[in-house]
Amino acid sequence: MTAGEDCRTILVAGTASHVGKSTVAAGLCRLLADRGLSVAPFKAQNMSNNARAVPVADGAPPAADPWGEIGVSQYVQARAARTAASTDHNPVLLKPRGDAESQLVVDGRAVGHYSAGSYYESHWADARDAAAAAHARLAADNDVVVAEGAGSIAELNLHDRDLANLETARFADATILLVVDIERGGAFASLHGTLALLPDDIRDRVAGAVITKFRGDRSLLDPGITEIEARTGVPVLGVIPHDDPGLPAEDSVSLPDPSERVVDGGQDGVPDAASVTVAVPHLPHISNFTDLAPLARTPGVRVAYQPLDAPLAAADAVVLPGTKNTVDDLRAAREAGLGRALRAFDGPIVGLCGGYQMLGDRITDAATESTADDLGAVDGVGVLPVETAFQPDKRVEAVTRELADCGALGGATGAVTGYEIHMGRTTVPDGVPQPVGPASAARGRVLGTYLHGLFGNDAARRGFRDAVFAAAGVEQPAPADTPDQSPSDAAAALVDAHVDLDPLGVPPAPDA
């Protein structure tokens, strides 16, 4: 079989959000790639503030900038598929910056900010064309495209404009694998109702369903599976146990409510008394919180997402994360007293992207970023001597930086890699240390940088860990054992062990 000939598209759709679509899709990508097939992930339209810088795809509309952005999940799935990520893997990205407005990104490039009504009325048709063209390019070069849907495939109010689900199924001629989560209860009712609400042409594409997040004795499900198959005519192709492979979360659905304090980490066997806590103020428009995942996996480190008005007294360090709306979130943080708390905090503080901008003295041209159009300038937290001006053009690029000694990173040095996605331009006065390359800044215990993925680098993560443990006066635990499997391999093992792929029409391996 030659790549591109009779390419099969499998659409991993769901009965709801957060049912495990991304995990199943990533598992399929790795499993099929390891069988010798050329595989590409795809999500026609994603809504997420977790984004990643990738090259603009060959064949995409030309642009001066060779870099664009896609959702983090599609980047992870591309790595799972053992292929280089590009903008074709997620051609339409919506990045919310308020309750009624999102930034539209098409083929990796920011187009503008629109309300839902404006997007659907004036831009959706072009977005659909871009998505269909991106899929066609992927299908021409691969044996299998593993497409991921969004939310529920049965949203009746969206059936005439559901780009990630119904439209993808149609223009990709996709076979659908329907994912239903049993952990929240009502799995059989959800599956039956979803199938009943699908248009006939879409329902006919459903090859089977898979139940995720199951705990307990698998055989206890058998009577329900037998009946749901009889009622719907759709086979249940597998039951995946509740076993998190450790893939990055796709969007804020996986985060706690902003009014709650929830700790990530703690599965390392290290007693809380021998651990340190990194507080992460839960900004209203938090973005790229996947930056914090490597810290939560570090032995002895607890990452605590907490309300803006929660005290920092129990924290040993603070990371102020990225945000899709720096100005509005800064105003919310100041009103909650977070600015005063940060100025009084005596442990390490790291600001990432929007969090870095907030730590500075001042932000100008604020209306470019805020949902309020009458702002000129706003004062920052004032713990870093920098100023940021927002501009209409966005910087998107994968970068390599050289670390220089700074307190917040425990004196770590060496090259680090990551990516930048931001519309602000930060001015750093002469004489202010820039330990993470141009436009970064440090003063005492505080560091600000635009580098997403900083803690994914061993040197930076270990340096920050060392600084936090030293500041807290806590002895570090012994290093943890390296996991036997990568998250992608773990996801593939779950799919391989628990899902029957034959009804999906997967092409045979090249040597089969």
From Swiss-Prot:
Q: Which residues of this protein are catalytic?
A: C353 (nucleophile), H452
* Tagged with keyword Cell inner membrane: no
Concerning InterPro entries, the annotation shows: Class_I_gatase-like (IPR029062), CobQ/CobB/MinD/ParA_Nub-bd_dom (IPR002586), CobQ_GATase1 (IPR033949), CobQ_synth (IPR004459), GATase_3 (IPR011698), P-loop_NTPase (IPR027417)
GO BP term, pick one: cobalamin biosynthetic process
Q: In which pathway does it act?
A: Cofactor biosynthesis; adenosylcobalamin biosynthesis
Q: Name one GO molecular function term.
A: ABC-type vitamin B12 transporter activity
What are the entry keywords? Cobalamin biosynthesis, Glutamine amidotransferase
**Annotated GATase cobBQ-type domain residues:** 275-460
Against Gene3D superfamilies, the record matches this protein to:
3.40.50.880, P-loop containing nucleotide triphosphate hydrolases
**SUPFAM superfamilies in the record, alphabetically?**
Class I glutamine amidotransferase-like (SSF52317), P-loop containing nucleoside triphosphate hydrolases (SSF52540)
Q: Give the protein's function.
A: Catalyzes amidations at positions B, D, E, and G on adenosylcobyrinic A,C-diamide. NH(2) groups are provided by glutamine, and one molecule of ATP is hydrogenolyzed for each amidation.
- What family, per the record? Belongs to the CobB/CobQ family. CobQ subfamily.
What is the protein name stated in its UniProt record? Probable cobyric acid synthase
Name of the encoding gene: cobQ
